[in-house]
């Protein structure tokens, strides 16, 4: 009974959800229809705000904005990647290490003074990192990759006065964003093929190191070959479609919903700064 129930429990364990990058979640919503430049401006503004005002109020209000945007965009819970166990262990070790630093506030437990300052600082940095990661994930989940490069070219148009090659940078960004998912898939296939290869355990430690070195060299050579092949195919496709200028020539301008989004973000940011500066520090 016990020997058969254990495999059953292991067999019904849910598989871990992988990290999906640069692939939008299917659907139609107000967040999906926003101009890509608006999303980039919101991410940039919130990042600057959290850099200069990394308080709990600011983090909480920005987290509320991200959660509201995810709810409006109908982002399913399955889109969230599974947190690996080793990351929880690293966070626990970091929390314990930071808690040893002490600091204010101090809590008395059974006559022992415990400083919670280090632990609170660690939790605040962790929460800030989660908010920034969620912002980037929202852009990835609701934005087509082809819309990012034209938005960067449009936003960087004022810098052309300084002779900054904005269009060339936008084209390079478009190529990188389009090549990244393909290369990730190719590397996963190469890694899976390497794991399926039959292995013989060398008798000595030196032989094992030599085998690992040979496998690493073979994997790097295959990765370079795949990268060059994909680059050649992408170059042919770009040439057939009219050159690199078409990559940053996607029409797109802010609409009413974009201005409303920027206004809501500015109001929330201003409210958070006012609470942090005037009320909590008065």
Curated annotation (Swiss-Prot):
Superkingdom assignment: Bacteria
Gene Ontology cellular component terms for the protein in this record: plasma membrane
UniProt keyword terms in alphabetical order: Cell membrane, Membrane, Transmembrane, Transmembrane helix
InterPro entries membership: ABC/ECF_trnsptr_transmembrane
Primary location: membrane
Lipid bilayer topology: Multi-pass membrane protein
Transmembrane segments: 18-38, 40-60, 87-107, 119-139, 164-184, 260-280
Signal peptide: none
Annotated compartments: Cell membrane
This protein's name: Uncharacterized protein Mb2352c
Organism: Mycobacterium bovis (strain ATCC BAA-935 / AF2122/97)
């Amino acid at each position: 009974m016990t020997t058969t129930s254990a495999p059953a429990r292991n067999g019904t364990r849910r598989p871990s959800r992988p990290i999906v990058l640069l692939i939008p979640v299917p659907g139609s919503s107000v967040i999906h229809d926003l101009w890509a430049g608006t999303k980039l401006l919101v991410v940039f503004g919130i990042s600057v705000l959290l850099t200069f005002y990394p308080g709990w109020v600011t983090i909480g209000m920005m987290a509320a904005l991200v959660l509201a945007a995810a709810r409006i965009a109908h982002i399913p819970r399955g889109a969230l990647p599974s947190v690996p166990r080793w990351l929880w262990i690293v966070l626990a070790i970091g929390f314990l290490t930071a808690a040893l630093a002490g600091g204010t506030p101090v809590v008395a437990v059974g006559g022992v003074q415990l400083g919670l300052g280090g632990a609170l600082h660690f939790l605040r940095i962790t929460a800030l990192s989660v908010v920034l990661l969620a912002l980037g994930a929202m852009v990835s989940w609701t934005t087509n990759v082809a819309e990012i490069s034209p938005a960067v070219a449009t936003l960087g148009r004022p810098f052309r006065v300084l002779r900054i090659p904005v269009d060339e940078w936008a084209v390079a960004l478009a190529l990188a964003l389009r090549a990244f998912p393909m290369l990730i898939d190719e590397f996963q296939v190469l890694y899976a093929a390497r794991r399926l290869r039959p292995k013989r355990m060398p008798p000595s430690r030196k032989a094992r190191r030599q085998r690992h070195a040979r496998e690493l060299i073979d994997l790097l050579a295959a990765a370079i070959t795949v990268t060059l092949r994909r680059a050649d195919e992408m170059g042919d496709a770009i040439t057939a479609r009219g050159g690199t200028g078409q990559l940053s020539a996607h029409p797109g301008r802010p609409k009413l919903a974009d201005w409303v989004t920027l206004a809501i973000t500015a109001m929330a940011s201003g409210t958070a700064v006012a609470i942090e500066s005037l009320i909590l520090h008065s």
